[in-house]
Amino acid sequence: MSAVRHVASVLLAFALYCPFAEARQSPADVLADIERNGRAAHSDAVLIQKDGVPLLDVASTSEPIHLMSATKSIMALAIGLLLDDGKLASLDEPVSAIYPEWRQGQKRDITVRMLLEHTSGLQNVPNAGVELESAPDLVQLALAAEITSVPGSAFSYNNKATNLLPGIIARLAGQPVDAYLEARLFRPLGITRYDWMKDEAGTPLGMAGLSLSARDLAAIGQLMLDGGVAKDGTRLMSEHAISLMTVESAQSADVGLLWWRLPEWERYTLRKDAQRTLRERGVSDRLQHALLAAEDSTFASKSALMAHLSQQLGDDWQPLYATEITGRGLKIADLFQSQRGPVSAYAANGYLGQHLVVVPEQRIVAVRLIQRRESHAFPVDDYATFPAEIIRLAKSMPALAAPATGIGGAQDDVAVHTEIRSTASPIRL
């Protein structure tokens, strides 16, 4: 067995089912595990802070690293700033109010919120390399997309839809999103080195493209944790705008506004009717075999499922999954039963294993970044267990008083959602 496959097996064993006994480890023990696992995953930066004080800071570079899809979460902050600045009246503003060409058909029903919650219903190819990376104007590509589901009716991760956000921000802010964020967030936070990929039309990408150092990404996380207040005490965003980022989406408990909501624990087991579902949808025998091999397993995360598929299928598992599962309209919930604990953290995550994790109860901000290399080995180098390990670190620490800013419980989420949706101007609540 190769070294990569051996480490993959170790990580998969951890991900399949995390023993509750691990919660009794000391913080020092968990930090040692994270440092060891971070090195095994060839991380370029692992930074963990508590109340802004580093607990672990291991880095091979201080240079900006491409955040991949974690860029989306920072894009959402720009929308929050538009609310604060009064340039966007409501998250439920129809996109057609900004782009009049959408006033016809079902597109007139798409709101800014739907773009942020992945519920727009716009046609989308799961693999960004197929359609998006070669497009000269990503805003126009999104505007021209067909509708494949009723807007607002279902969660479907959508790179194409998020590429419309930079266009919206530019029209409402009067400047490109990179310039807007530099003036309103980056410069006040001391972020001076960053890069943002642009399409041929000169528009910064929405789905990815932003590069930051681990420390600068942690500064974004600390701003979230502190409810919009910078380290020097300056308020950069309203606490309300910050809280909107992690309110549960109407169509998925996993997401807020382009931020992921992380439960303390989750378990996935194969549904008894999974084989029938796979056959009815025409899924290939090869992928059926890989999924049905999980019949007697319990997975502790979606990432563990993906690691299982990688082991079963090899290097081409991702395009196969995108074509056979996502492309046929199937979701994990169609094949696996799930259980999950209370939401205790939120995260910005990106391809290759870019992670920003915030645990409000213990005031932890954690970052893991890795540079893109030809030698990148999935699932080892993706370090998909990093968010779960940060939650485990938080659970190993003594309980603190409830934080002033955090993730609302179910009742709080419902109250906030109801209040937001019943007003034309959320920022004045």
Regions found by a protein language model. Give the residues of each.
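Bacterial N-terminal signal peptides that target proteins for export
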Residues: 1-8
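Penicillin-binding protein/beta-lactamase superfamily catalytic region
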Residues: 179, 194-326, 332-358, 375-378
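Boundary at the C-terminal end of the N-terminal hydrophobic targeting segment
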Residues: 21-25
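Short, gly/Ser/Thr-rich active-site loops of penicillin-recognizing serine hydrolases
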Residues: 377-429
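Bacterial N-terminal signal peptides
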Residues: 8-19
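A short, well-structured edge-of-sheet supersecondary motif
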Residues: 28, 32-61, 356-359, 363-367
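Active-site SXXK
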Residues: 52, 66-91, 115, 165-169, ...
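Active-site helix/loop module of the DD-peptidase/beta-lactamase fold
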Residues: 85-122, 144, 173-212
